[in-house]
């Protein structure tokens, strides 16, 4: 809670879901802070009574037998006590991130949580950590276990951010994505643990964002993306529908969107004149969170087998693509993405070089970063992974040695595909 400043909000911070982070309360005459929706007030972690309540609640769940916790925006629980104005970057509001991410007491609070709750149970913990750097990640997910087991970082998801933050139609450049991967894999080596993900409930579909979801390339592109994920070092996460290659929904009207972030952003950017309605809709088609929130596609029956209710009763519309992938089709086809993901998991489990202790080294194949290549190794086992996200075939040039079947040290990688080789 904060008092008004000159009769207005305490500062100029903009909320992640649009508008100000401050909501005025008539009863108290004060403002309360909400970094996201006004229905999600930020807890005051500086108050020891609040921390007691949180830890008691967590203990209650642990005693019920939960396996762990995924902690939402946990890097934002400690704020700069001065609450200064932020730089106006989107033309509308001040940027709060320097003052709410990785704040002065965040590690103190997490260590207290660990001592009082987490260390007393057999749990897995992952912290969603907006604004985290590799240096901060070494504290959140350090291998001494004093805070969390691993983090969800967003740097690879932010490679397209520009003038209006996430709202863009640009696709990620592999060169930038590769640089982010290289940094996180190398910087955390032997010091902290990372999660691996492309998809989740807050991100558009991976094959639409990082690959090619056209009918010609959707399946091979999704396999390429899956191979890259499962061959990296860290704990891989698979989001529902990712294993069958679900794509962005590409809704054509703002009325089809349900996410508060998308609706508020559309309203703010179009009413302010920063974007036209068409421009903003194109941004939503590319990066809206609703792309990941359409119903799971089980089969070709009504509502893709998700529900027998009328389509108008669903929370959100189905992907309108009539040729959309379904679990039934994917499970029936032996060479499908679904079976490829299962194979990748088996391969990862059966090769030490691909497991937690396996070292990773990125290889520069070409100046434009196509294809992306890296080596995983443990003991005398070495595995070269090559990822080609380009729309055409590319040659990977590497001194494979006599053990590899490659002519003059070259392997040609087809468009939108991946391969891995013992070397």
Regions found by a protein language model. Name each.
Residues 1-423:
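Active-site and adjacent substrate-binding regions of carbohydrate-active enzymes
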């Amino acid at each position: 809670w904060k008092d008004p400043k000159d009769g207005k909000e305490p500062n100029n911070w903009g909320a992640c879901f649009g508008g100000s982070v401050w909501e005025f309360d008539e009863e108290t005459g004060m403002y309360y802070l909400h970094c996201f929706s006004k229905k999600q007030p930020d807890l005051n972690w500086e108050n020891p009574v609040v921390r007691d309540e949180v830890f008691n609640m967590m203990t209650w769940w642990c005693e019920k037998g939960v396996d762990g916790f995924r902690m939402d925006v946990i890097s934002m629980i400690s704020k700069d006590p001065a609450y200064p104005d932020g730089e106006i970057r989107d033309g509308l509001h001040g940027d709060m991130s320097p003052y709410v991410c990785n704040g002065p007491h965040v590690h103190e609070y997490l260590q207290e949580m660990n001592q009082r709750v987490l260390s007393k149970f057999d749990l897995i913990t992952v912290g969603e950590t907006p604004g985290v750097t590799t240096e901060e990640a070494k504290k959140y997910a350090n291998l001494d276990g004093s805070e969390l087991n691993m983090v969800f970082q967003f740097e690879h998801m932010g490679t397209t951010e520009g003038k209006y933050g996430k709202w863009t139609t640009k696709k990620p450049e592999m060169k930038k994505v590769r640089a982010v991967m290289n940094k996180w894999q190398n910087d955390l080596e032997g010091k902290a643990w990372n999660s691996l993900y492309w998809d989740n409930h807050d991100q558009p579909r991976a094959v639409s964002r990082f690959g090619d979801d056209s009918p010609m390339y959707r399946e091979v592109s999704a396999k390429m993306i899956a191979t890259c994920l499962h061959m990296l070092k860290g704990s891989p996460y698979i989001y529902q529908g990712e294993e069958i290659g679900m794509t962005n929904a590409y809704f054509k009207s703002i009325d089809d969107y349900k996410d508060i972030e998308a609706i508020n952003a559309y309203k703010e950017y179009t009413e302010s004149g920063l974007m036209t309605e068409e421009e903003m809709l194109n941004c939503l088609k590319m990066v809206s969170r609703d792309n990941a929130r359409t119903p799971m596609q089980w089969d070709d029956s009504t509502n893709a087998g998700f529900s027998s209710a009328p389509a108008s009763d669903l929370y959100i519309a189905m992907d309108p693509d009539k040729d959309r992938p379904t679990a039934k089709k994917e499970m029936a086809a032996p060479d499908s993405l679904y079976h490829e993901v299962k194979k990748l998991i088996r391969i990862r489990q059966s090769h030490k070089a691909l497991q937690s202790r396996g070292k990773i080294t990125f290889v520069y194949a070409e100046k434009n970063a196509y294809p992306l290549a890296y080596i995983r190794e443990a003991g005398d086992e070495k595995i070269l992974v090559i990822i080609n996200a380009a729309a055409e075939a590319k040659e990977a040039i590497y001194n494979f040695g006599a053990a590899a079947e490659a002519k003059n040290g070259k392997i040609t990688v087809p468009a939108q595909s991946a391969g891995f080789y013992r070397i």
